[in-house]
Amino acid sequence: MVKLNSTTAILSDLDGVILNLDYDIKFWESWLPEHVANQSNQNLEEIKIKIQAEIDTQRGTLNFYDLNYWDDLLNVDCMEIIREQEEKCSYLEGSHEALQRLSTLKNPKHILTNGDPRAQEYKAETQNFLEFFDSIFYSMHAGYPKEQKEFWTLARHNLNLDFENAIFIDDDFKVVTAATKVGIKQVIWITPGKNRVLQNGVETFPSLADLTAAII
């Protein structure tokens, strides 16, 4: 059972917890390969296979999240591609209301994200999620992704965190596992299905809205 006192730090991922991950999926699976194919006059399916192969190679590293890496690799401007789209990012169902409820608490609140800072700042122009948090801590600035213990050392120092009195929320199981290994006492995995507690102590909730309803 999630326990929250007045000083418990609330640490949350962004994409897949607060914002709908479909937006990012469309970038990687549609917008980016279509742009590269049009620009290079290459077969779209071949480009998709090439990009997916590199994604699989870089997954869990900073390169995977760093749009500068993909700019250089594919000779594109990822942010220009994103800005050209009519579609904008959106909140997951119930997450905006959940943030409004959490905002009534005086607890310290921070976003911890692997996402590229430029992309996340652009998303904040559309959905002002930053108003609900004290800060946003980027793995790009830390120099390590959330999958690595070094990220957590820097996050603890920079945000003055007590891992014994913190809740971390994420939708990526590898990140969730990394958080438990560095000693965060309460780790929440946002994943479909019934609420349950895993063997490593991680507690699951289907959504941020479900978690918020359980603690407020």
Annotate each predicted stretch with a short phrase.
Residues 1-10, 100, 116-117, 121-216:
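Asp-based, Mg2+/Mn2+-dependent phosphohydrolase catalytic module
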Residues 4-97, 118:
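N-terminal helical cap/lid subdomain that shapes the substrate entry/recognition surface
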Residues 37, 71, 85, 110, ...:
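Short, flexible active-site loop motifs that bind/organize anionic cofactors or intermediates
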Residues 76-90, 95-127, 136-139:
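Substrate-recognition element of Asp-dependent hydrolases with the DxDx(T/V) motif
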